[in-house]
UniProtKB/Swiss-Prot annotation:
There is a cross-link at H239-Y243 (1'-histidyl-3'-tyrosine (His-Tyr)). This is Cytochrome c oxidase subunit 1. CDD domains: Cyt_c_Oxidase_I. The keyword Coiled coil does not apply. The chain crosses the membrane at residues 16-36, 62-82, 101-121, 144-164, 182-202, 233-253, 267-287, 304-324, 337-357, 384-404, 413-433, 451-471. Pfam families: COX1 (PF00115). GO terms for molecular function: cytochrome-c oxidase activity; heme binding; metal ion binding. Fe(II)-heme a binds at H60, H377. Gene3D superfamilies: Cytochrome c oxidase-like, subunit I domain. Pathway: Energy metabolism; oxidative phosphorylation. The gene is COI. Ca(2+) binds at E39, G44. It is a multi-pass membrane protein.
């Protein structure tokens, strides 16, 4: 038992560990988000002052990003599916794969420690100085958060190296890059983004660490530094990061839609690959659209506005290719199909509010209001999370060999759908009316929409608990899958369900069709 789970070098076992860790962290993050919505459910103070509130917000963001979405998408689905889809016996560096996982529990422990010592790190997930300096945040909270980020970053970089090596070196002999499954492509591009962006974050937070403890002044104007430098460094990581969070979701949705449509491949397969590459590349040249209010030159703002809008083009290509894949099929509203359709629609809504925010002139007004919160929660809470849910219910029979109850899954989908939309749609109105982010209290004008938003969060909580109940029900009833309804073009379903410990004893042969 100890050898299997602690010292594992098997991509499936490590993937399962990532899933268990991510689901646990997701429940912690959800609990924090409910604390936020409980505080905002009515005017006046509930939990305490803004420092406590902002500590909760900061922890919620870090946990959801670094310990829920990334471990599940890249660690869970990536580890499980990339070797199976490539026909590889395992990942390229199995022991490094194990280390990537085991760096995460210490990392989350450091993050939780940062909340419970001193006053907590109430900086927001961006950790901007001078608020995060040792004057405004004395004590070790921010330092612990920085070390937590270091560990999570090392974990992701090692994982990225592993995926890139696996994808380049462990394909079947005659499989060219354009024949690779879209999910493998999406994980490969994600890994490349991680590899290029995380070192910049590491540099920024290390400089912040020395500013706080070793008396340097990288971000302190009194010593010739500039806090804006930190913002540039952080967002040079932070913007690719949001594409890292969504790209594997794109890959999963492509697979689910083409398989559920009964098509042998996604419409415009090659275009999908180029679109993901374009999104990855453009993701690196638009970072300052997070900084339209710091007083940049007008030409700079014009450039970042237009460059940001260009990202909508490859994203649109993906949306329309998914719709074209669905075209002409008799749609079977299975749970995984419902999640995919929900993803396409709600991700599009989130993308449209993003295009609005890309206008620097409008963003000056909307920056740091709930409009921004609504925008990124539409693409994360209804993009990334819907993709995770869809991928999970789609590949669960492959991972476990068991069936989930489709009737309960549909009830769960509609509960969650109503919950998240009720939570985040009203926040657009709050933002347009000027309600600022990161405050625990607000003028009475904003009360009604906040009550509705908080109500939605309670519905989402019920949906989350329902999902856990469905998984539990499946595990105790053990409805064993007899045969998968797969297309010939998805080779992961040719395994036993669940797959054997060693799935490919010899490399599969690719035939031209």
């Amino acid at each position: 038992m100890m050898r299997k789970w602690l010292y594992s070098t098997n991509h499936k076992d490590i993937g399962t560990l990532y899933f268990m860790f991510g689901i646990w962290a997701g429940m912690v993050g959800t609990s924090l988000s409910l604390l936020i919505r409980a505080e905002l459910g009515n005017p006046g103070s509930l939990i305490g002052d803004d420092q406590i509130y902002n500590t909760i917000v900061t922890a919620h963001a870090f946990i959801m990003i670094f310990f829920m979405v990334m471990p599940i998408m890249i660690g869970g689905f990536g580890n499980w599916l990339v070797p199976l889809m490539l026909g590889a016996p395992d990942m390229a560096f199995p022991r490094m794969n194990n280390m990537s996982f085991w760096l995460l529990p210490p990392s989350i422990m450091l993050l939780i420690s940062s909340s419970i010592v001193e006053n907590g790190a109430g900086t927001g997930w961006t950790v901007y100085p001078p608020l995060s300096s040792n004057i405004a945040h004395s004590g070790s909270s921010v330092d612990l958060a920085i070390f937590s980020l270091h560990l999570a970053g090392i974990s992701s970089i090692l994982g990225a190296v592993n995926f890139i090596t696996t994808i380049i070196n462990m394909r079947p002999n005659n499989m060219s890059l354009d024949q690779m499954p879209l999910f493998v492509w999406s994980v490969g591009i994600t890994a490349l983004l991680l590899l290029l962006s995380l070192p910049v974050l590491a540099g920024a937070i290390t400089m912040l660490l020395t500013d706080r403890n070793l008396n340097t002044s990288f971000f302190d104007p009194a010593g010739g530094g500039d806090p804006i430098l930190y913002q540039h460094l952080f967002w040079f990581f932070g913007h690719p990061e949001v594409y890292i969070l969504i790209l594997p979701g794109f890959g999963m949705i492509s697979h689910i839609i083409s398989q559920e449509s009964g098509k042998k491949e996604t419409f415009g397969c090659l275009g999908m690959i180029y679109a993901m590459m374009a999104i990855g590349l453009l993701g690196f040249v638009v970072w300052a659209h997070h900084m339209f209010t710091v007083g940049m030159d007008i030409d700079t703002r014009a450039y970042f506005t237009s460059a940001t809008m260009i990202i909508a083009v490859p994203t649109g290509i993906k949306i329309f290719s998914w719709l074209a894949t669905l075209h002409g099929t008799q749609i079977n509203y299975s749970p995984s199909m419902l999640w995919s359709l929900g993803f396409v629609f709600l991700f599009t809504v989130g993308g449209l509010t993003g295009v609005i925010l890309a206008n620097s002139s409008i963003d000056v007004t909307l920056h740091d209001t709930y409009y921004v919160v609504a925008h990124f929660h539409y693409v994360l809470s209804m993009g990334a999370v819907f993709a995770i849910m869809g991928g999970f219910v789609h590949w669960y029979p492959l991972f476990t060999g068991l069936a989930l109850n489709p009737y309960l899954l549909k009830i769960q989908f509609f509960t969650m759908f109503i919950g998240v939309n009720l939570t985040f749609f009203p926040q657009h109105f709050l933002g347009l009316a000027g309600m600022p982010r990161r405050y625990s209290d607000y003028p009475d004008t904003y009360t009604s929409w906040n009550i509705i938003s908080s109500l939605g969060s309670y519905i989402s909580l019920v949906a989350t608990m329902l999902m856990l109940m469905i998984i539990w029900e499946s595990l105790i009833n053990k409805r064993i899958i007899l045969f998968p309804l797969n297309m010939n073009s998805s080779i992961e379903w040719y395994q036993n369900l669940p797959p054997a410990e060693h799935s490919y004893n010899e490399l599969p042969i690719l035939s031209n069709f």
